[in-house]
Amino acid sequence: MSKYWSNITKNIEPYVCGEQPKNKKIIKLNTNENPYPPSPKVLQAIKNAARDDLRLYPDPNCDALRKTIANYYNLSKEEVFIGNGSDEILAFSFLTFFNPEETVVFSDISYSFYPVYANLYKLDYKLAKLREDFSIDINDFKNAKGGAVITNPNAPTGVYLSLDSVKQILEDNVNKVVIVDEAYIDFGGESSVSLIKDYPNLLVIQTLSKSRSLAGMRIGFALGQKELIKGLNRIKNSFNSYTIDRISSLAAIESIKDEEYFKECTSKVIKTRNWTINELGKIGFKVIPSKANFIFITYDTYEAKNIFVKLKDENVLVRYFNKYRISNYLRVSIGSKEEMVIFIDKIKEIINKL
């Protein structure tokens, strides 16, 4: 620990991301990436973007990308905010909408970045305890003094909250912002975007990392009424006006436009997810119902950590969380059908030997 560090730097507990192995032979099912490549139109746009105008700064407002996303969701361009991945937008949002003296509510089992942002900005927060089946009790979010954050579908559980429940939380917090983090919404859930016109306190955050196969380009976006977006821009422009580079912006536009490819890939992920759930059930695993591109699994008589280690020994990498209430669960990203067949074969071998 350096004597030059500030007190915040000394005391903060940073987010720990999933392992990124260098061994290309590993079947990587630990960070919820899409098993399929970006749209061919995206790859062509990237090639075309390698021009001499890269010497110039990009559009700080990302107008072309905002217009593309706005058209896709039947919103105005002024209701769209672009960020360097949804994580950056979440960080900006915590600073834009939440006050230190007011308690923000999010679930006790949810995205691990939320408490990091809260602690970084010295925000008070309350952890709403999920039920035993990992579902949200919406009463825990009623009259949140500082605002609320909901991951839908939730991570790492994959549990989806109905649109009616989201509406109720919005109506119970009309004077505070409710953030709905929809990183995984395209794998079977119904987005809250349709509620924006009726709820000025709703901010929906999505990413192109999962369903659009662009995790390597870091593009996220927020959707909400104009005043919320204005607030986000005030904070963004107090840090860095140029958060999105030219190439990423062009790639993102083509990704949004190629609806046919998007639907094809998400459909394959959903089909493979359902197949995997069925196969795991046959050998005694309990699988939490999922609307995401991952599943949350446990086996009553075997420790999850041991299964995690043995899978890793077999070059299959999944995610283990050594945390209260979920230490006997594994989160498994849905890979290609071929990868998931290998995963099932390996986990069968492990269970038979334990």
Swiss-Prot record:
Coiled coil: none annotated. GO terms for molecular function: histidinol-phosphate transaminase activity; pyridoxal phosphate binding. It is an enzyme of class 2 (transferase). Gene3D superfamilies: Aspartate Aminotransferase, domain 1, Type I PLP-dependent aspartate aminotransferase-like (Major domain). Pfam families: Aminotran_1_2. InterPro entries: Aminotrans_II_pyridoxalP_BS, Aminotransferase_I/II_large, HisP_aminotrans, HistidinolP_aminotransfase, PyrdxlP-dep_Trfase, PyrdxlP-dep_Trfase_major, PyrdxlP-dep_Trfase_small. Its EC number is 2.6.1.9. Keywords: Amino-acid biosynthesis, Aminotransferase, Histidine biosynthesis, Pyridoxal phosphate, Transferase. Its cofactor is pyridoxal 5'-phosphate. The modification N6-(pyridoxal phosphate)lysine is found at residue 210. HAMAP family: HisC_aminotrans_2. Homodimer. This is Histidinol-phosphate aminotransferase. The gene is hisC.
